[in-house]
């Protein structure tokens, strides 16, 4: 009986030892798995943070830097503002009752109003003058408030023509024809100059011959 009891005790001890070692190994495996899972989750979260948050932050910084680097837009010159048309609000001009977009009050009769020439919007003189000192566009439609002057083309000028040159008509002639006509005019002038010089030489020779004949006689 004693031997059987000893055998049972040894079996129980070996069982508990095996179960204890199994529990320890399973705990180690569980801790290792959880640790790796946490590391993977942290790396994935950091990847998402770097991809979206940091990228958006850098893009916003670039945008804010470009906005700050742009010079502030100035308003119109005081002389340009003073040159814009003004009038007194009355019944005939159909402006009474129109809302001023700057002060949000209605234009009443006998108020001094100013009209922007490019978009025809009307405001109080004091309101729009204050606006145009810092802005150069209409408060309503953002059209440039400075009047656009039409470009004047210079009138064609005709060069001086000599006394001996005949009048030429260049109407309806293109550039090539005009160039050839000018070259022909120059050659014609040269021919006339040569003929005149040769005629003068002939006349001088005839005069010299006559003088010699008179001296001989």
Swiss-Prot record:
InterPro entries: Znf_RING, Znf_RING/FYVE/PHD
E.C. designation(s): 2.3.2.27
A Gene Ontology cellular-component term: membrane
UniProt keywords, alphabetically: Membrane, Metal-binding, Transferase, Transmembrane, Transmembrane helix, Ubl conjugation pathway, Zinc, Zinc-finger
EC class: transferase
GO molecular function annotation: transferase activity; zinc ion binding
Catalytic reactions of this protein: S-ubiquitinyl-[E2 ubiquitin-conjugating enzyme]-L-cysteine + [acceptor protein]-L-lysine = [E2 ubiquitin-conjugating enzyme]-L-cysteine + N(6)-ubiquitinyl-[acceptor protein]-L-lysine
Keyword Transmembrane helix: yes
Metabolic or biological pathway, per its Swiss-Prot or TrEMBL entry: Protein modification; protein ubiquitination
Compositionally biased tracts (Basic and acidic residues): 143-160, 186-217
Transmembrane segments: 28-48
Record note on domains: The RING-type zinc finger domain mediates binding to an E2 ubiquitin-conjugating enzyme.
Similarity annotation: Belongs to the RING-type zinc finger family. ATL subfamily.
PANTHER family in the cross-refs: (WILD MALAYSIAN BANANA) HYPOTHETICAL PROTEIN, E3 UBIQUITIN-PROTEIN LIGASE ATL42
This protein's name: RING-H2 finger protein ATL40
Source organism per UniProt: Arabidopsis thaliana
Lineage: Eukaryota, Viridiplantae, Streptophyta, Embryophyta, Tracheophyta
């Amino acid at each position: 009986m004693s031997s059987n009891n000893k055998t049972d005790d040894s079996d129980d001890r070996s069982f508990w030892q095996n179960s204890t070692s199994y529990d320890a190994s399973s705990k180690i495996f569980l801790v290792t798995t959880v640790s790796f899972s946490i590391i993977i989750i942290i790396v994935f979260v950091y990847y998402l943070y770097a991809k979206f948050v940091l990228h958006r932050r850098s893009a916003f910084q670039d945008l804010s830097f470009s906005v700050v680097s742009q010079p502030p837009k100035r308003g119109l010159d005081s002389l340009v503002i003073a040159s814009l048309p003004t009038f007194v609000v009355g019944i005939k001009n159909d402006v009474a009752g129109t809302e001023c977009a700057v002060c949000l009050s209605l234009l009443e009769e006998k108020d001094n109003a100013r009209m922007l020439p490019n978009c025809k919007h009307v405001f109080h003189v004091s309101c729009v003058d204050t606006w145009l000192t810092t802005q150069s566009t209409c408060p309503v439609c953002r059209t440039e408030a400075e009047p656009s002057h039409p470009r004047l083309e210079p009138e064609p000028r005709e060069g001086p023509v000599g006394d001996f040159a005949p009048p030429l008509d260049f109407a309806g002639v293109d550039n090539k024809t005009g160039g050839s006509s000018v070259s022909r005019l120059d050659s014609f002038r040269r021919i006339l100059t040569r003929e005149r010089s040769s005629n003068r030489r002939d006349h001088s020779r005839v005069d010299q011959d006559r003088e010699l004949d008179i001296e001989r006689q």
